Amino acid sequence: LICLTSPVLGQINVGYPRVIYKEDNDDDVVSKQYVQRFIDATKADMFFANKLIFVEGVAEELLLPVFARYLNKNLTDEHVLVVNMGGRYFNHFLKLFDTNNPYTINKKIVCLTDIDPCRKKNEPDEDYEACYPYEYNIDTANYNYKHHADTEVAQYAAHPNIRFYRQDVTYGKTLEYDIMRENPDCELLLTNSVSNLKEIKAMMAEQDMNKMMSKMRNSEANTRIKTSIGASKWTDEEKRKALLASRYLNSVSKGSNALELNVVLMANLDKPVADRKEFHVPQYIVNALTWLLS
């Protein structure tokens, strides 16, 4: 397989995927096997796109095209392909496109990943578990904390053709969390597949934190949310956003909710401007698409 790309008018780059993965390198052998299985199954069209967005799951795959439309962009017109990796397997594919190395394919690549804050107890044999942004570094005497993809974000920050983007390091968690955090008053998000629909809608109608918390049903998960947010030093505005985002995150199924949200957001966009409800694309996705399409 030989891949020809033209990143600049009049310039031709030649990529040789076969020679990128070294047979005497164990990591490369594993990566090559994964890439071969993946491409044989569904994704050979990535070689024909001008630019690529690698995502971890179906929610990003379904929502990115409509997010682009809200930014007055069209991924199809820009020949951008969204590739769902089905997990955190970016490293296997980035070897194909890393232009710091010879024989690679010169395409602009964005990798979208969740920041996923997590913590583990300062005790032997403990594992990291997911935590909320407002719990991060709140109890350093008893927990260690970390974010996902710190290494990758730094590694590719100045790369010629690859970038990693994720949610805000202070307030972010996942795509679904950020959608609600940046749209805390947007009822478009309350699709039929959202459980606890009436509860979240009632919370949205309140501005006072105590009144919002009073709308939440009793559960261990909700008690943790309320206790942790109450201990946070964030502003009331950020606490309100976080409370709604946490409740929303725990009430959605990624695939079905993303499909319904895609339909609802497109229908909103198709209305006359005066009739549209306000919706904000999560900022990390705005940043990613701005870089990719520049």
Report residues per predicted region.
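Structural recognition of the conserved hydrophobic beta-strand(s) that form the central parallel beta-sheet
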Residues: 1-5
